[in-house]
């Protein structure tokens, strides 16, 4: 009798464990969670950029290999002649794709007095390309642009927009 109860107990608990494994199989759990986190990117011992946020979830353990940043997200990009700062409420970095998505109160400012605001912005880090399908505002020392779509290099020297309004200075 004891042997039958023991076998029944093992059978029930093993089935219960298997069902928990099956239930949790598709659940995506971050590899780590950090507060007040900063990630630095270097090239040949030179700091090229860093990204920070109040909360960071690392999902590099997933096939998509991404990180999420929440609250006061800031990406600072250093060049030889200028620095660019991108701020937002939320960002997701797709590490293997070399791609960043910014959402909520996105602001770009540069040391060349350029600024851009949007509700959403995508940044291709490999090609240094910015784009959005949302409304945005861009301004520099001589131009002020409001438009519905942006497709531009990070220096704003090759800028394509949709439904443009505002003022642009054109030189001959």
Residue ranges, per PLM feature:
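Mature-chain termini and adjacent capping regions
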Residues: 1-172
């Amino acid at each position: 009798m004891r042997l039958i109860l023991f076998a029944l107990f093992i059978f029930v608990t093993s089935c219960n464990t298997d069902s928990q494994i099956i239930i949790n199989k598709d659940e995506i759990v971050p590899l780590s969670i950090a507060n007040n986190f900063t990630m630095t990117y270097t090239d040949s011992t030179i700091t090229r950029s860093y990204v920070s946020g109040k909360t960071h979830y690392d999902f590099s353990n997933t096939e998509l290999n991404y990180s999420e940043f929440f609250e006061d997200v800031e990406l600072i990009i250093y060049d030889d002649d200028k620095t660019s700062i991108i701020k937002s409420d939320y960002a997701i970095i797709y590490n293997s794709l070399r791609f960043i998505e910014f959402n909520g109160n996105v602001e770009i400012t540069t040391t060349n007095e350029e600024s851009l605001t949007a509700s959403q912005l995508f940044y291709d880090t490999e090609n240094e390309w910015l784009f959005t399908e949302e409304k945005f505002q861009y301004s520099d020392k001589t131009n002020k642009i409001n438009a519905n779509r942006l497709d531009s290099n990070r220096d704003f020297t090759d800028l394509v927009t949709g439904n443009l309004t505002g003022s642009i200075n054109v030189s001959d």
